[in-house]
């Protein structure tokens, strides 16, 4: 249920007055947090391809074999393909039961009108799987709920402040190299562009996007 609430808050959809979503700061362990978003964003086309393979084959071992055979025949590097495969399949494998099983996603995608609709659905899998993205989305949801000016400001400055406020359950703090953090910030902006929060490559302050009918049903 919280996934739907987060999506509602981020997109300013009325949620019937539910209690504010609490911060995840202090609740996550360092082991739960990673920078996978620096490797790949939503990658709608590739995620759709993986979901179709899984729907066809029914198991991830066959999907992996076919995926790498096709990548290598297209002269992709194995290292790059492995990273993308690991990150994208993790989002599917760790999805809560409240989201569609990846085996039925191709049918869900067939009902989508636009690539943005598909991105808005894949965003839910990302938020469910990636603890750092989830923490940041919770913080932005709180900014929207509090009525802050420019609540959806995804500038490096605002993002860095939010990331810097993250403390782990063991008392330690978020601590990554500045260059890595900047790549992560660009990654989250890329996601926000794909789901319609940010418009244009240079825009860093967003607005509530229109949400497609199918993404709303999924959320």
Predicted regions and their residues:
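Eukaryotic partner-binding/assembly regions in large regulatory complexes
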Residues: 11-132, 136-139, 145, 154
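Short amphipathic alpha-helical interaction segments
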Residues: 80, 178-191
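Acyl-donor binding region in acyl/amide transferases
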Residues: 148
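DNA-recognition alpha helix
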Residues: 154-171
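Surface-exposed cleft-lining segments at the edges of enzyme active sites
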Residues: 170-178
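Accessory, usually C-terminal, subdomains that scaffold auxiliary metal cofactors
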Residues: 179, 193, 197-219
């Amino acid at each position: 249920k919280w996934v739907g609430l987060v999506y509602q808050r981020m997109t300013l959809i009325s949620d019937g007055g539910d209690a504010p979503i609490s911060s995840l700061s202090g609740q996550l362990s360092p082991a739960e947090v990673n920078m996978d978003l620096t490797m790949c964003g939503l990658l709608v086309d590739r995620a759709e391809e993986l979901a179709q393979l899984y729907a066809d084959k029914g198991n991830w071992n066959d999907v992996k074999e076919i995926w790498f055979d096709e990548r290598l025949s297209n002269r992709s590097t194995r290292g790059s393909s492995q990273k993308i495969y690991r990150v994208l399949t993790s989002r599917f494998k760790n999805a809560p039961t409240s989201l569609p099983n990846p085996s039925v996603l191709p049918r869900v995608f067939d009902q989508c009108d636009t690539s943005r609709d598909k991105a808005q659905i894949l965003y839910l899998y990302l938020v469910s799987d990636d603890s750092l993205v989830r923490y940041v989305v919770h913080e932005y949801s709180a900014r929207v709920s509090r009525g802050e000016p420019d609540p959806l400001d995804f500038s490096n400055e605002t993002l860095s402040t939010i990331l810097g406020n993250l403390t782990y359950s063991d008392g330690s703090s978020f601590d990554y190299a500045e260059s890595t953090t900047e790549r992560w910030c660009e990654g989250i902006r890329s996601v926000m562009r794909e789901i319609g929060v940010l418009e244009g490559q240079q825009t860093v302050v967003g607005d509530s996007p229109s949400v497609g009918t199918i993404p709303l049903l999924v959320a």
